From Swiss-Prot:
Annotated catalytic residues: D39 (nucleophile)
Organism from which the protein derives: Streptococcus pyogenes serotype M3 (strain ATCC BAA-595 / MGAS315)
Alphabetic keyword roster: Isomerase, tRNA processing
Protein name: tRNA pseudouridine synthase B
Record GO biological process: mRNA pseudouridine synthesis; tRNA pseudouridine synthesis
Spans traversing the lipid bilayer: none
InterPro entries the record matches: PsdUridine_synth_cat_dom_sf, PsdUridine_synth_N, tRNA_psdUridine_synth_TruB, TruB_C
MF-aspect GO terms: RNA binding; tRNA pseudouridine(55) synthase activity
EC assignment: 5.4.99.25
EC top class, as a word: isomerase
SUPFAM superfamilies: Pseudouridine synthase
NCBIfam families: TruB
Function: Responsible for synthesis of pseudouridine from uracil-55 in the psi GC loop of transfer RNAs.
Gene of this entry: truB
Length: 294
């Protein structure tokens, strides 16, 4: 069995599920999952867990993500990105300056509330929102709180001859954030229709785009029996508090027994030497093995 984390550079035109399906065939390994869905048109970092690493991928999805993208002011779409049909057009504000855009972007920092787009996989009454959208049905969407730690403009405002304005941005955000909704809400705050016209995920769970591999690159390495693209399973628990255990505690964990450890953290990544061997969960005053990885 292959175990580890892959820093995959997902290319445009494929779903996150497509990427997993292709890797299963390529690596001849059924136990593969991804950490954090990317829309088909979005490129960038997609953490992939293989083998035992699938048991810790949930702890990677809790980590923050960094995106780089582009906002287009002047019209909105059904999907809130460039792939959708035009819903409405509007003229640009009489006064639209870089200073105004920058000031408005700062109002989205911290904890904010978003309404997920209709074309998303969020479930309402057991059905995904995009299923309602494709059927032409309306449904009340649950608002959710997300965290934005960085939201800044990274290019000058580009005014086009057809009355649009585009600019690039960078955003660092927490789990569950819809960046296309952020682009739409920014436009609304500026008093203009808008959508997200480009997006790439440049970092996720400590993995960066600079060190990511495409499916083609991975296929080429596998054909040469080169597996250096596979990161240790320990990358999957990098954001959890670490606790080094001794041989006696290792034996106790292997039998599923509770341990008394000097910590108050709700979850611990238990290490024996340099290897993660379990995820421990605090129960009363002791730690119970939640996931044993040996």
């Amino acid at each position: 069995m292959i175990n580890g984390i892959i820093n995959l550079k997902k290319e445009a035109g494929m779903t996150s599920h497509d990427a997993v399906f292709k890797l299963r065939k390529l690596l001849q390994e059924k136990k593969i999952g991804h950490g954090g869905t990317l829309d088909p048109d979005v490129v960038g970092v997609l953490p992939i867990a293989v083998g035992k690493a699938t048991r810790v991928i949930e702890y990677m999805t809790e980590a923050g993500k960094v995106y780089e993208g582009q906002v287009t002011l002047g019209y909105s779409t059904t999907t809130e990105d460039a792939s959708g049909e035009v819903v409405a057009r509007s003229s640009l504000p009489a006064v639209l300056t870089e200073e105004l855009v920058d000031q408005t972007m700062t109002t989205f920092l911290g904890k904010i509330t978003q309404t997920p787009p209709m074309y998303s996989a969020v479930k309402v009454n057991g059905r995904k929102l995009y299923e309602y959208a494709r059927a032409g049905e309306s449904v009340e969407r649950p608002r959710r709180e997300v965290t934005i730690s960085l939201f800044e403009r990274t290019s000058p405002l580009n005014f086009t001859e057809d009355g649009l304005c585009r600019f690039s941005f960078k955003v660092a955000c927490g789990k569950g954030t819809y960046v296309r909704t952020l682009a739409v809400d920014l436009g609304r705050a500026l008093g203009v229709e808008s959508h997200m016209s480009f997006l790439q995920r440049s970092a996720s769970a400590g993995l960066t785009l600079e060190t990511a591999y495409t499916l083609g690159e991975i296929a080429d390495m596998v054909s040469k029996q080169e597996m250096s693209f596979l990161l240790p399973i320990e990358y999957g628990v990098a954001d959890l508090p670490k606790m080094v255990i001794d041989d006696t505690e290792l034996t106790e964990i292997s039998f599923g027994r509770r341990l008394s450890l000097p910590s108050q953290e709700p979850l611990l990544a238990a290490f024996h030497g340099e290897k993660v061997i379990a995820i421990l969960e605090k129960r009363d005053q002791e730690y119970k093995p939640k996931k044993v990885l040996i």
